[in-house]
Amino acid sequence: MQSLPSRRSETNKKIISEKISETITLNKLPMSRYLHFFLFTVTDVDDIWNFSETKESSLTWPKIDAKQLNEYVNTELTVYQRPFSLLGIPQNGLFKSCEKIYDEFFAEHMDNEKKYLTFPRNRSSRFGFENVPRVNELPILINHFEKSRMDVILNTNKIVLVNRELIWVPCEQVRIFNLNVSLNIPDGLFGILTGTVNDTLCECVTELITTENVISISLINLSSESVMLLPGDIELVINILPCYIPEPWETYNFPSPNFIKFSLITNKDFYVESNNYTIQNFDYMFDCPDELKALIIANKEILCHGLVVETNIWLKNTTPSVKIFNPTSQRIFVQAGICIATIIFTCGHFILKLLPNRVLNQLAVLDKTSMLWFQYSTE
């Protein structure tokens, strides 16, 4: 292989390598909410370029050495083909290329092999791996256990989990499902887990992730029969957000915080009728800066009783109201003094999506520009 002697050529060569490694082609499958995404990138893409110099120009666009490329494909790469949900397309990270199939390259989002993600993608091709600029904050540690039924996809500012095995949810029950994925989130941050299930008769409750080592989700079956969820039917998104603990003079009637969260405790006895809901109001209030807001997330203890608490966004100078559903066929009694939800303060931006044919609304995080530092490992 020959390379141009000029310094300008060497610089352009590196920039071209970085550009090529970011080429992604999306191809949506007919009548499907899934798509295949194809990416071709190599560890050392500079090795497959051929530069030529002519009299008309001192620099020409590089051409691919087809023979060397085929040797690399046949010896270095592995075959992998998998559909990913439209909601879980990786926005950044490291990838593993795969063998050429039908004139396209299928790619799998790589599990980083315990390496740190850097942003923007492939800056190591320009700076060198040892000199890549990185954030100084502590990384968010992700431990993916071998017995997990979920695939883990890392993005710039969130984690996407997709089930790769069948999952059964008994009729008219709440199943707390262990994901066998643990997170170690640095101080000052917390996680919000939201889920989407293809089956309209099955709901995934929003979860708050603070000090939990192993993450679990709550799946609710609203039908009178057991529900079988196929691989790819459950898609979970974990967003990492900054937390805020208000000063005592900024809250009214609040209990003492537990670490970074507050408990929303019932002050009277009440019943929730079968297949119905009730709205409970609380005499709480806070007065914080305008950019701060509180999230009301269901407590897992109330889920064990068969009740579902809808996620809500609580703004300052207002009193909170909580909607509690009873999807079972029995009337449920709730005593005073029970924690039905958790309150946490943050400065993120959110909306509540009202989805068709859904009982619960869904919390959506609008902060898309933040970049986080993940460290992934497997056991």
Curated annotation (Swiss-Prot):
Superkingdom in the source lineage: Viruses
Record EC number: 3.6.1.23
One Pfam family this sequence matches: dUTPase
Named cofactor requirement(s): Mg(2+)
Keywords: Hydrolase, Magnesium, Metal-binding, Nucleotide metabolism
Classification via SUPFAM superfamilies: dUTPase-like
UniProt GO molecular function: dUTP diphosphatase activity; metal ion binding
Swiss-Prot/TrEMBL GO biological process terms: dUTP metabolic process
Catalytic activity, as annotated: dUTP + H2O = dUMP + diphosphate + H(+)
Family according to the record: Belongs to the dUTPase family.
Functional summary from the UniProt entry: Involved in nucleotide metabolism: produces dUMP, the immediate precursor of thymidine nucleotides and decreases the intracellular concentration of dUTP to avoid uracil incorporation into viral DNA.
Entry protein name: Deoxyuridine 5'-triphosphate nucleotidohydrolase
Source organism: Human herpesvirus 7 (strain JI)
Gene assigned in the entry: DUT
